[in-house]
Amino acid sequence: MKNLLLITIAAVLLVGCQTETTTTFDIDRARTHIDKQNAKYMEFFNNGDASGVADLHVDEAIVMPPHTGLIKGKEAIKQAISDEISAGATDIVFTTLDMYGNEDYVTEVGRFSLNIKDNGKIVMNDSGKYIVLWKQVSKDNWLMKADIWNSDLPIKK
């Protein structure tokens, strides 16, 4: 009987000590804020502001463009974006296809298009796909942690 009483008390204590974890994460709310960040990226990029684009990344961010090595950190990202802009890249547009994650990280899958201009004349159109890992650094403030993309254009032989 003593054992039954001890087991009953232990069970009551265990049940009483359990805390239910419920998440209040709202992917639609996150998407609203990430969409705003994407709009800023497009505005900065299309206006030649590599610093503005770099500021949309966390300090330790990595960027993985096609046909080149890994780019680490905001300063290196700023330089890479500046090089792209100097090469004539402009008119970038992002289209989000999917977004999923949690309160800490969200993965965005999408498509992009851009133009390459020389003396104001379009000399090439490019389009492709991307994946971005967004990190929530404070309430409703999402910055890029990792970014990888590639072009749909065939490699010239």
Label for each model-derived stretch:
Residues 127-153:
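Short beta-strand edge/turn micro-motifs at domain boundaries
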Residues 29-33, 50-102, 111, 124-125:
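A solvent-exposed, acidic/Ser-Thr-rich amphipathic alpha-helical stretch
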Residues 119-121:
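Outer-membrane beta-barrel domain signature
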Residues 99-106, 135-141:
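A short, structured loop/turn motif at beta-sheet edges
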Residues 17-51, 55-56, 156-157:
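Short, low-complexity N-terminal intrinsically disordered segments enriched in polar/charged residues
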